Amino acid sequence: MSDINATRLPIWGIGCDPCIGDDVTALLTRGEASLC
């Protein structure tokens, strides 16, 4: 899980807040990035 977050955070951190990194990862897993 840490490896996935570490890979996603730098990329999505630009458009999304790092604080919601976990939520973003969950959305990406479902294929839904509506928040971004």
From Swiss-Prot:
There is a cross-link at I11-P18 (Cyclopeptide (Ile-Pro)). Keywords: Thioether bond, Toxin. Transmembrane segments: none annotated. Residues 1-10, 19-36 form a propeptide. One of its GO terms (molecular function) is toxin activity. Processed by the macrocyclase-peptidase enzyme POPB to yield a toxic cyclic decapeptide. POPB first removes 10 residues from the N-terminus. Conformational trapping of the remaining peptide forces the enzyme to release this intermediate rather than proceed to macrocyclization. The enzyme rebinds the remaining peptide in a different conformation and catalyzes macrocyclization of the N-terminal 8 residues. InterPro entries: Amanitin/phalloidin. There is a cross-link at W12-C16 (2'-cysteinyl-6'-hydroxytryptophan sulfoxide (Trp-Cys)). The keyword Iron-sulfur does not apply. Toxin belonging to the bicyclic octapeptides amatoxins that acts by binding non-competitively to RNA polymerase II and greatly slowing the elongation of transcripts from target promoters. Belongs to the MSDIN fungal toxin family. The typical symptoms of amatoxin poisoning are gastro-intestinal distress beginning 6-12 hours after ingestion, a remission phase lasting 12-24 hours, and progressive loss of liver function culminating in death within 3-5 days. One of the few effective treatments is liver transplantation. This is Beta-amanitin proprotein. It comes from Amanita phalloides.
